[in-house]
C-alpha cells in the first residue's frame, strides 16, 4: 500500500513539474520573427513528401525558389509559433494557391490584427506546440508499421511475465522460466525501440498539438469558427491516439528522474514501451489521415497569425486586386513596391502588360536583379498570403518563372550556357501552354558570344511576350546590359533603367526606376575605385570610347 501511494505521489509530482515548465514558457512577442535556426531541409521535409505523394501541386519550382532567394524571404516572414505552422508557411508559398483557403486565412489574419484579445488567445493556444519533434510529425503519418513484426509478441510476453510472477510464491520454478523470458523481452524492447528512435520526439508532440487544437476550439470568434469546428471534430477522433502517444513518449515519467527510475523497473517486467509501440502502430494505421488533416488546419491557423504579425511590422502592405475584365490583357501593376527584407528600400511603381515586355537596363550594382526579385517575390506573396509589400497591387498572374542566378552545373558536366539553355527551353514550353505567368530573366545567354546572345535573346523574348503569334498571355521582364536589344525589341518591349549618378568619380545608386535606356556606365569607375592601375583604366576607357564610336557609325547602340 505504501509503495502504491509513493508511486502515485511521484507520478503526480512529475506531471505537475512538467505542466509548470510548460506554463512558464514565454512565446515570442507579436510582431517579431521566430528566429528559428532549424535547417531548411528539415522545415521542407513535409512539403517535399506531400509533393512526392501528389498531395500538392507545385507553383514555385526549385529553380525559381533559389533565384528569388526565397529561403531568406521565408525566414523574414517566419513569425510562426509552431513547427507545423513553419512547415505550412513554406507549403503555402510554394504550392498552387487555393482561393477559398486563402480567403478564409486572410479573413482570420485581419480579425487577429483588429482584435488584440483574439491575437493573444490564438498565440497562447499555439504555444502549446513548440518541440523540435514537431518537424517530423509527418513521418508518423507515413509510417506503415512501428517496431517490426516481432513487436506483436509483446502482449503475450507481458501476460506470461505477469502470470509467472503471480505463481512464483507457490511455484518457485516459475522464476527460472521468468528470467530467460525477461531477457528475451529486453532484447525485443531494445530492438523495437531502436527502430523508432527518431519517432519518439514526434510522438511526444502529438499531445501538445491536440491541446493547442482544443484551446483554439474554445475561442469564440466568427473568423476562427470554420477552423474550430473542424479541429474539434478531428480532435475528438484522435483521443485514443493521444493517450497512446503519451505512453510511447513517456511524457510524464521523463520529467522526473525518480519517477523515471521506477518506471524502468516496471517496464522491465511489463514491457510497457513495446506494448505502447504496438498500440501506437495500430492507432496510426487507423488515424494517420485524421492526424494529418488536423496538423494542416493547425498550421494554417498559425500561418494566419504569422501573416497578421508580419503585416504589423511591414512599412507598407496591401491586399492585391485580382482578375481582369473580359477581353483585357493580363496585367501586373504595383505602386511603391518593395521587399520584405528591405524595410528601408526605395519603392518603385512598375506595370507589366501581356504583349508588352519590360527591358531593364542599368549599370552594374544599380539594382536590376534586385528589382526582378522584388517583382517575383511580391507575386508569390500576393498569390499565397494575400499580402504585397506595396501601396497598391493589381495581379492577374499567380505563377512566376525565373532565370536569374547563372551557374555551371559541374556535377552534370554542363557549361553555363548549356545549363541556362535547358532552363530557357523549359520556360518556352511553359509559355506556349498559355498559362498566365510572369517570366523574369537576368542577362540572358551570358555564357555565349555577343552576336548569338543578342539574336537568341531577341527570339526568346518575342516568343514569350507573344509578338510571334499573338496568343501568349505571359508577362516578361529582362534585365540586360545589351542596349542593342532595346532597338531590336522596341516594337514589343518598353525600356527602363535604374537611376545612377556620378559626382567627382563617386557613384551614387538611387535605385529609382526611370523610363528609357541607361546611359551611365560604372564598370570602369568601379575598377578605378577599387585601386586598379591607372594605365589599365585609361586604356579600357579609350577602347570603350572607340567601340562606342564604331557602334554609332554602324547604326548600333
Spans of model-derived segments:
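ATPase nucleotide-binding head domains, primarily ABC-like/P-loop NTPase cores
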Residues: 188, 307, 314-557
Amino acid at each position: 500500500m505504501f509503495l502504491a501511494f509513493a508511486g502515485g505521489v511521484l507520478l503526480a509530482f512529475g506531471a505537475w513539474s512538467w505542466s509548470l515548465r510548460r506554463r512558464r514558457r514565454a512565446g515570442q512577442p507579436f510582431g517579431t520573427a521566430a528566429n528559428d535556426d532549424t535547417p531548411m531541409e528539415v522545415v521542407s521535409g513535409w512539403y517535399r513528401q506531400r509533393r512526392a505523394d501528389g498531395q500538392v501541386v507545385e507553383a514555385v519550382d526549385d529553380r525559381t525558389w533559389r533565384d528569388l532567394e526565397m529561403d531568406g524571404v521565408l525566414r523574414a516572414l517566419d513569425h510562426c509559433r509552431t513547427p507545423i505552422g513553419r512547415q505550412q508557411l513554406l507549403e503555402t508559398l510554394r504550392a498552387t494557391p487555393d482561393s477559398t483557403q486563402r480567403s478564409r486565412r486572410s479573413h482570420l489574419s485581419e480579425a487577429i490584427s483588429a482584435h488584440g484579445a483574439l491575437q493573444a488567445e490564438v498565440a497562447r493556444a499555439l504555444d502549446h506546440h513548440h518541440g523540435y519533434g514537431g518537424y517530423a510529425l509527418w513521418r508518423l503519418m507515413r509510417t506503415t508499421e512501428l517496431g517490426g513484426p516481432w513487436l506483436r509478441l509483446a502482449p503475450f510476453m507481458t501476460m506470461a511475465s505477469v502470470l509467472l510472477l503471480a505463481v512464483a510464491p507457490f511455484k518457485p520454478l516459475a522464476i527460472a522460466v521468468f528470467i530467460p523470458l525477461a531477457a528475451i523481452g529486453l532484447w525485443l524492447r531494445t530492438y523495437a525501440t531502436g527502430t523508432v528512435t527518431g519517432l519518439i520526439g514526434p510522438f511526444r508532440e502529438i499531445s501538445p498539438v491536440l491541446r493547442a487544437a482544443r484551446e483554439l476550439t474554445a475561442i469564440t470568434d466568427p473568423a476562427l469558427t470554420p477552423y474550430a469546428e473542424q479541429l474539434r471534430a478531428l480532435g475528438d477522433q484522435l483521443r485514443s491516439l493521444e493517450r497512446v502517444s503519451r505512453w510511447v513518449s513517456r511524457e510524464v515519467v521523463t520529467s522526473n528522474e525518480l519517477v523515471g527510475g521506477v518506471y524502468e523497473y516496471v517496464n522491465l517486467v511489463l514491457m510497457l514501451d513495446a506494448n505502447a509501440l504496438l498500440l501506437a502502430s495500430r492507432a496510426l494505421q487507423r488515424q494517420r489521415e485524421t492526424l494529418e488533416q488536423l496538423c494542416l488546419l493547425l498550421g494554417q491557423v498559425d500561418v494566419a497569425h504569422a501573416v497578421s504579425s508580419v503585416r504589423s511590422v511591414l512599412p507598407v502592405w496591401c491586399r492585391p486586386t485580382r482578375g481582369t475584365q473580359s477581353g483585357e490583357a493580363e496585367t501586373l501593376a504595383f505602386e511603391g513596391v518593395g521587399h520584405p527584407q528591405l524595410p528601408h528600400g526605395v519603392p518603385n511603381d512598375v506595370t507589366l502588360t501581356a504583349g508588352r515586355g519590360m527591358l531593364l537596363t542599368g549599370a552594374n550594382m544599380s539594382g536590376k536583379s534586385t528589382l526582378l526579385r522584388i517583382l517575383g517575390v511580391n507575386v508569390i506573396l500576393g498569390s499565397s498570403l494575400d499580402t504585397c509589400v506595396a501601396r497598391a497591387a493589381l495581379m492577374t498572374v499567380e505563377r512566376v518563372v525565373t532565370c536569374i542566378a547563372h551557374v555551371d552545373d559541374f556535377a552534370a558536366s554542363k557549361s553555363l550556357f548549356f545549363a541556362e539553355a535547358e532552363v530557357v527551353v523549359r520556360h518556352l514550353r511553359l509559355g506556349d501552354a498559355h498559362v498566365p505567368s510572369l517570366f523574369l530573366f537576368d542577362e540572358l545567354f551570358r555564357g555565349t558570344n555577343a552576336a548569338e546572345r543578342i539574336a537568341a535573346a531577341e527570339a526568346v523574348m518575342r516568343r514569350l511576350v507573344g509578338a510571334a503569334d499573338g496568343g501568349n498571355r505571359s508577362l516578361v521582364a529582362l534585365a540586360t546590359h545589351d542596349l542593342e536589344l532595346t532597338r531590336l525589341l522596341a516594337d514589343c518591349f518598353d525600356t527602363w533603367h535604374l537611376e545612377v549618378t556620378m559626382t567627382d568619380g563617386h557613384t551614387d545608386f538611387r535605385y529609382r526606376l526611370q523610363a528609357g535606356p541607361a546611359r551611365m556606365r560604372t564598370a570602369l569607375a568601379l575598377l578605378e575605385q577599387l585601386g586598379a592601375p591607372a594605365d589599365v583604366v585609361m586604356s579600357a576607357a579609350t577602347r570603350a570610347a572607340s567601340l562606342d564610336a564604331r557602334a554609332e557609325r554602324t547604326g548600333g547602340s
